[in-house]
Structures are given as structure tokens and as C-alpha cells.
């Protein structure tokens, strides 16, 4: 997820090192970490449902975590894939930056884990 967020931010011309809340000089992806925060419950839900407390991060668990990019999530009351929800959030951030006004950001809403159905 962090890589998808970072690529989307870079595609919109934003500097990843300048965060909103994260501000470590040693972290080159402060902004990506800020934008990633609303998507953290998606990972938490997967871990709670699929990985036992004493289990190591197995290859199958890693595949499952990677597959979260293909999951469904609500964005602006519509079902979207996670990468598109990330893009919508970045677009709303760009509006706030470019027009010096603070409209509500398009934050994701967690839904039960399911693969996104493309039309």
C-alpha cells in the first residue's frame, strides 16, 4: 500500500519528503506515510482475520497483504478499488493545496474484505 500511495503522490508532482504530520528528516516518504494512515484499518482487518498471533509473516500472508490492493473500499459513498480510492484522496489533497481552501478530503471507509468487482 505504501508503494501505491508513494507512486500516486509522485504522479501528482508532490514531494514525498514533506509530510503533513510525519516530519522525520530520516524518512524520505513522510507524505506517503500521512496519506497511508486512513488505509491502515484495511491492513489491520486482514491481519486480524487471517494471521494468527504466533504466526510469522509467511509467503501466503504476504500474498494476501499484496492482494489488498484489489479489495473493495468505500470512497465518497461509492465502491472503488484501493488504488483508485488512494488516487481520489490525493486528488482531494491537491484541491486543498492548489486552491488554498480546505474542502473535506475524500477519505476511505472500511467495508468487509472483498475483491473489487470491475465493470
Residues of each region from the PLM?
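N-terminal intrinsically disordered, cationic/polar leader segments
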Residues: 2-119
Amino acid at each position: 500500500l505504501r508503494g501505491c500511495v508513494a507512486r500516486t503522490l509522485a504522479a501528482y508532482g508532490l514531494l514525498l519528503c514533506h509530510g503533513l504530520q510525519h516530519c522525520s528528516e530520516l524518512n524520505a516518504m513522510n507524505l506517503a506515510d500521512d496519506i497511508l494512515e486512513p488505509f491502515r484499518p484495511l491492513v489491520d482487518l486482514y491481519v486480524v482475520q487471517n494471521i494468527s498471533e504466533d504466526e510469522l509473516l509467511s509467503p501466503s500472508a504476504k500474498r494476501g497483504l499484496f492482494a489488498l490492493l484489489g479489495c473493495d473500499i468505500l470512497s465518497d459513498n461509492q465502491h472503488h478499488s484501493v488504488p483508485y480510492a488512494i488516487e481520489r484522496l490525493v486528488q482531494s489533497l491537491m484541491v486543498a493545496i492548489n486552491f488554498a481552501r480546505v474542502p473535506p478530503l475524500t477519505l476511505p471507509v472500511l467495508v468487509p474484505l472483498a475483491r473489487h468487482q470491475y465493470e
